[in-house]
Regions:
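FIC/Doc superfamily catalytic core
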Residues: 1-282
Length: 282
């Protein structure tokens, strides 16, 4: 699949855009601020995909004043976005320094999935919308997903096999970066290894993998914007992947590249705001 001309063109476009972003003037000294702001914008965008609409200014204020110490605040929308922000901030903590040699250790794939899922779904458990024993724990046996998605969510041995394949793909030493990130995202959507929060965790994994694999090392691309802006295209591409055809999988990978490119454009806007000192109003 990585040799398909459409996939190769998509990956080339992503790498070119990310290279331009990498050498943005704002990231020479203020990359930490840019990553922090990207985590906020990513949480707002991802929340919108999930139906939780919160103003960026509201989340920034909550973060700045340290009010997000509890999983449940009484505002379900804010709680959902805060969980996404916590997960995004966790990813930032695992990113190598953009300037310097710091390279934090990243947990194994199963632990990575569990940690991100706890951040994302913890607020749902705190408010009683999912059971505590579903948080950070993949489905097994005949446990059904609470979420819809493309195709039929597997169960039993099929589910166990899909989850094992997902873990192996995340940890594979050599894999085409864009294809890996795209397939991991798609498997979260279609296999739905958890009872809830699969799509959001899938989008977080894309950000993590593209940074880890060196495609988008700045960690500032906001890849969640595109699925929120054009949800029909997101659903259509996911359905194409779930069809199991090569054409469908290629269409999904190309869609994922488009989402990354939109995220890079948002990162460039973010960098301009950081450089101008107006990023809090971004």
């Amino acid at each position: 699949m990585a040799a398909d001309e459409r996939v190769r063109a998509a990956e080339a476009a992503v790498r070119e855009a990310c290279a331009e972003l990498r050498w943005n003037e704002a990231l020479r000294r203020r990359w930490r601020e840019a990553r922090a702001e990207a985590a906020i914008r990513g949480a707002i965008a991802s929340g919108a995909v999930e139906g939780a609409v919160v103003l960026a200014e509201v989340l920034r204020e909550q973060v700045a004043t340290g009010r997000l110490t509890e999983a449940a605040t009484g505002d379900p929308g804010l709680d959902a976005v805060a969980g996404l922000w916590r997960a995004g901030t966790r990813l930032v903590g695992w990113m190598p320094d953009l300037v310097g040699r710091g390279r934090p250790a990243v947990p194994p794939a199963r632990s990575l999935l569990a940690m991100l899922h706890r951040d994302v779904v913890g607020p749902l458990a705190a408010s009683g919308r999912v059971d505590l024993d579903e948080v950070g724990v993949p489905r097994s046996g005949q446990v059904r997903s609470r979420e819809g998605g493309p195709g039929r969510a597997p169960q039993g041995e099929e589910l166990a096999g899909r989850l094992e394949g997902l873990v192996e793909l995340i940890e594979a030493e050599r894999a085409p970066a864009l294809v890996r990130a795209a397939i991991v995202h798609a498997e979260m959507l279609s296999a739905r290894p958890f009872t809830a929060g699969n799509a959001a965790v899938g989008r977080l994994l894309v950000r993590h993998l593209l940074v880890r694999d060196g495609v988008e090392p700045t960690g500032t691309a906001v890849g969640d914007l595109y699925p929120g802006r054009v949800p029909a295209a997101y659903a259509e591409a996911a359905a194409a992947y779930a069809s199991g055809t090569m054409e469908g999988v290629v269409a999904w990978v190309v869609w994922q590249a488009e989402a990354v490119l939109v995220g890079v454009q948002e990162a460039l806007r973010l960098c301009r705001a950081v450089q101008a000192g107006t990023w809090r109003a971004g």
